[in-house]
């Protein structure tokens, strides 16, 4: 009789523990989905980001816009502005290094909240994302070994070169436009390495990156850039329909008025490219 009572108590204890575990798991799942549910009910990406407490920023290694310092922290003009904007809406910025060719998938899957990485406002980007107003001017430039630069001073002269370009980038678009052969790599930094190693004749990269990373006093002292293939502008991309784009436009305007945006640009020597708001 006593053994039966003990057995019943053991069974009851197991059931209670199991029920408690299920309840706790359900609670955790509820916490992680609260931000999503509120965003769905309000239709606000801004509220979604505020509720979860983080703005997840998709980036690549792209000096002077986004790159890691000696401590492994993301810095650069875009990175610093992202941190400041996140603070202004009461959250923290987190940085995730992405495959540039998959940036739209990362956004739509909510593994990131924005693409803030010197992104050129081409038609494809503007049709698939909610983009801010342009905040910086740029161009795609041709990078070649410095001792060969004199040979490549116009588009016609570079058409027969083999290029390295970042997959899905504006540089890739421009190389396709002129009809040159190219190899797509994972980042603009990798494109520079391809030229430095002799695997490619040239690279098409952002002018701002070229100014920061090649030439005398850099790790690519033997490289230089010659011609511009286009003129373009940078913007930040959010999920289609996101109200964060308008919030960031407002922040850009205020930070231009109070001088903080220009001060940040001066830190990374890109102030001449800023678009006045």
Residue ranges with predicted function:
Residues 29-31, 79-88, 169, 233-272:
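Extended ligand-binding regions for polar small-molecule ligands
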Residues 95-106, 150, 167-170, 183-197, ...:
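Short helix-initiation/N-cap motifs at beta->coil->alpha
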Residues 144-162:
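Flexible hinge/capping segments at coil-to-helix
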Residues 55-56, 90-92, 109-117, 161, ...:
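Alpha-to-beta junction loops
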Residues 58-63, 96-101, 110, 114-122, ...:
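Beta->alpha turn/N-cap motifs
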């Amino acid at each position: 009789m006593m053994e039966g009572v003990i057995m019943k108590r053991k069974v009851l204890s197991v059931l209670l523990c199991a029920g408690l575990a299920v309840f706790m798991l359900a609670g955790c799942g509820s916490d992680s989905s609260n931000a999503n549910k509120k965003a769905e009910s309000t239709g606000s990406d801004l509220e979604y980001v505020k509720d979860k407490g983080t703005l997840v920023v998709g980036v690549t290694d792209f000096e002077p816009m986004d790159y890691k310092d000696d401590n492994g922290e993301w810095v650069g003009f875009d990175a610093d502005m992202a941190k400041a904007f996140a603070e202004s809406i009461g959250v923290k910025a987190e940085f995730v290094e992405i495959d540039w060719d998959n940036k739209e998938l990362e956004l739509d899957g909510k593994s990131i909240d924005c693409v803030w990485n010197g992104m050129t406002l081409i038609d494809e980007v503007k049709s698939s994302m909610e983009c801010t107003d342009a905040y910086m001017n740029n161009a795609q430039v041709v990078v070649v070994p410095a001792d060969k630069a004199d040979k490549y001073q116009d588009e016609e002269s570079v058409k027969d070169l083999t290029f390295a370009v970042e997959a899905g980038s504006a540089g890739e678009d421009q190389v396709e436009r002129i009809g040159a052969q190219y190899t797509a790599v994972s980042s603009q930094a990798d494109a520079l390495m391809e030229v430095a190693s002799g695997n490619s004749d040239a690279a098409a990269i952002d002018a701002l990156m070229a100014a920061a990373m090649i030439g005398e006093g850099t790790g690519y002292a033997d490289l230089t850039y010659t011609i511009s293939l286009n003129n373009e502008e940078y913007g930040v991309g959010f999920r289609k329909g996101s109200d964060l784009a308008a919030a960031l436009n407002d922040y850009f305007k205020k930070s231009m008025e109070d001088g903080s945006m220009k001060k940040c640009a001066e830190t990374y020597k890109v102030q001449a490219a800023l678009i006045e708001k």
